[in-house]
Swiss-Prot record:
PANTHER family in alphabetical order: GLYCEROL-3-PHOSPHATE ACYLTRANSFERASE-RELATED (PTHR30309:SF0), INNER MEMBRANE PROTEIN YGIH (PTHR30309)
GO cellular component: plasma membrane
Compartments where located: Cell membrane
Species in which this protein is naturally found: Staphylococcus aureus (strain bovine RF122 / ET3-1)
GO-annotated biological processes: phospholipid biosynthetic process
Subunit record text: Probably interacts with PlsX.
Pfam family of the protein (one): G3P_acyltransf
Protein name: Glycerol-3-phosphate acyltransferase
Domain of life: Bacteria
Transmembrane portions of the chain: 2-22, 54-74, 85-105, 120-140, 141-161, 162-182
Length: 202
């Protein structure tokens, strides 16, 4: 029972809509009505500006990061293969990612999982996250598309999990990559049409 409570708590924390709350609280804006209509960090930068964008990014990363440690902090006990699986920090973090993408507070219309996924990886393997961040910024520098850099980094996480033979990370990163591609499908279409906005600060 406590495992279910932990996973639900992880989902609810992940579902906290940082961009929406910051936009409403400090700018009196519903971020969903501007830019891409997304509640995540990238649209927060675009609509609310850099300070708010950095705050939303931090909060979204923190959501994923903190949930990874729930199995250590909460009174959950694994007494079999199924309970062991669901008390793995990566699996608990996955529920936070799902909450971010499909938040119950906003009728299941949330962000694209990039920052929250980064927080989960930070919690379980900081060195891997550093490598992925380097890849992300290299792709971003070359092509100027946040969406493309995010997808490439996610796919590299799948490859990295194979290299280090972390098969739970492989499952989670594969699922997250699929979610990322689905959530970025409109961005992908705009890239092919030459209509996707490029960043201007790199």
């Amino acid at each position: 029972m406590m495992i279910i409570v932990m996973l639900l708590l992880s989902y609810l924390i992940g579902a906290f809509p940082s961009g929406f709350v910051i936009g409403k609280l400090f700018f009196k804006k519903d971020i969903r009505q501007f830019g891409s209509g997304n509640t995540g960090a990238t649209n927060s930068f675009r609509v609310l500006g850099r300070p708010a964008g950095f705050l939303v990014t931090f909060l979204d990363i923190f959501k994923g990061f903190i949930t990874v440690f729930f199995p250590l902090w909460l009174p959950v006990h694994a007494d079999g293969p199924i309970s062991t699986f669901f008390t793995n920090g990566l699996i608990v973090g996955l529920f936070a990612i799902l909450g971010h993408v499909y938040p119950v507070y906003l009728k299941f219309q949330g962000g694209k999982a990039v920052a929250t996924s980064a927080g989960v990886v930070l919690g379980v393997n900081p060195i891997l996250l550093l490598i992925l961040a380097i890849i992300f910024f290299i792709i971003l520098k070359i092509f100027k598309y946040v969406s493309l850099a995010s997808i490439v980094a996610a796919i590299c996480c799948v490859i990295g999990s194979l290299i280090i033979q972390d098969y739970i990370l492989l499952v989670v990163s594969f699922l997250v990559s699929i979610i990322l591609i689905i959530r970025h499908r409109s961005n992908i279409a705009r890239i092919f049409r030459g209509e996707e906005p490029k960043i201007k600060w790199m």
